[in-house]
């Protein structure tokens, strides 16, 4: 996501690598999201999440921290992939999704120490929140997708500090 401040406000641009888009064009995740396209799907979705969240927050006249931006993107990747997989599997819960998105992730080696810490913290908070979402709304005998969606919407609207607190304390 590219952001430029101008005298009239702000200009946003989203760059998605052509090779990512080309691979997604060959293996469309809207048709079948699986191991072959999940990484590219998440890469593209993260950029779209950043773009949308900055735009939405600006419209609400709210500042956004980089940590908040990363945390929301992690939750958005999980929620979006979950929604696609539930639809593609006729409602069967994709138990492997959490593990694939939150366990065993590696950071790129060129990141600074501050960037690594920010990504780790966002990842940790999102993992805790998403695991509790699964437990509360999806893994029980009676799944409650409408309540899950309401919780995700509420989380989206929280400010930076409240979002972090909620992710860690959500029960």
List each model region and its residues.
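Pan-zinc metallopeptidase signature
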Residues: 109-171
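Post-HExxH zinc-binding segment in Zn-dependent metallohydrolases
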Residues: 63-102
């Amino acid at each position: 996501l590219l952001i430029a401040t101008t005298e009239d406000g702000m200009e946003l641009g989203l760059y998605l690598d052509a090779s990512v888009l080309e691979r997604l064009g060959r293996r469309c995740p809207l048709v079948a999201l699986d191991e072959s396209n999940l990484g590219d799907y998440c890469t593209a979705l993260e950029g779209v999440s950043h773009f949308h969240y900055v735009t939405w927050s600006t419209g609400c006249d709210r500042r956004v921290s980089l940590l908040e931006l990363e945390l929301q993107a992690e939750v958005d990747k999980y929620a979006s992939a979950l929604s696609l997989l539930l639809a593609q599997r006729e409602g069967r819960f994709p138990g492997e999704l959490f593990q694939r998105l939150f366990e065993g992730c590696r950071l790129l080696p060129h990141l600074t120490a501050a960037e690594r810490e920010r990504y780790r913290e966002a990842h940790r908070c999102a993992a805790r929140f998403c695991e509790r979402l699964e437990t509360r709304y999806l893994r029980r005998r009676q799944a409650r997708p409408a309540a899950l969606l309401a919780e995700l919407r509420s989380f989206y609207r929280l400010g930076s500090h409240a979002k972090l607190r909620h992710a860690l304390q959500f029960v």
